[in-house]
């Protein structure tokens, strides 16, 4: 067995052990035990790795699928907990920093905006944006609206009414961003005419937790969206133990031209896929965001510099802050 295979086997064994420990927890609601295990999991999955999670043995693949479901459940409980905590403030938006991973959303939203601005032909100045899978803490929408798209209206969609009720409370005292935010209880598969009203559609990482489910969302978007851009969050390498991996070819088959794929190797865990729907996008051959051409089937891949050491230090600090916030709450 070569060194790379040994590295992959060791990682899979470690992740399998963490999955077993997480699965035995009596609850995935925020607690020191839950936080410690998920911190260990993220720390194990974030560094660059040669693992291809789509080629795991069936037993490991089943473990991965179960782990992604556990991650989704834990993330939902964590966000609901902090949404309730923030709602206790007179102006919740002044206290978003109490959430341990708020800085990650700032960095991810900045990356997504920069990729859209760089690769979407003609730049990006959307009047209306849909964010599908916003959840009880719609940080991505908020950061984009407050920092990058000050004139844009955001419609946030999630199929759980309780999540929307929580999200709505966070914006009750804000007259700027709050006036540009609305929340709708709906599944992406049920959206048809609405999709034609948006210039950009964001698809969150856990929308359609199985890769095949997420892939099915792309033809639906392609059938109902107006000409414009779609941004899909995915994962790469060992981060595929945390989130579903979306194949850019599936997006292409859904009626989109994939303009760019970004696999960050820093504290931004999600990969980002930029795609564009246009009825005449192939009339003159695919084009990149700078006006040049690239061969059909090839996509520019952008990878920011690795800041893993800083990320580990930040995770440790946030873990301590989380424990303090739990006590205070």
From Swiss-Prot:
Molecular function in Gene Ontology: nicotianamine synthase activity
InterPro entries named in the record: Nicotian_synth, SAM-dependent_MTases_sf
Function summary: Synthesizes nicotianamine, a polyamine that is the first intermediate in the synthesis of the phytosiderophores of the mugineic acid type found in gramineae which serves as a sensor for the physiological iron status within the plant, and/or might be involved in the transport of iron.
Protein name: Probable nicotianamine synthase 7
Gene: NAS7
Enzyme class: transferase
Entry keyword S-adenosyl-L-methionine: yes
E.C. code: 2.5.1.43
Keyword Transferase: yes
Sorted UniProt keywords: S-adenosyl-L-methionine, Transferase
Species, as recorded: Hordeum vulgare
Family stated for the protein in its record: Belongs to the nicotianamine synthase (NAS)-like family.
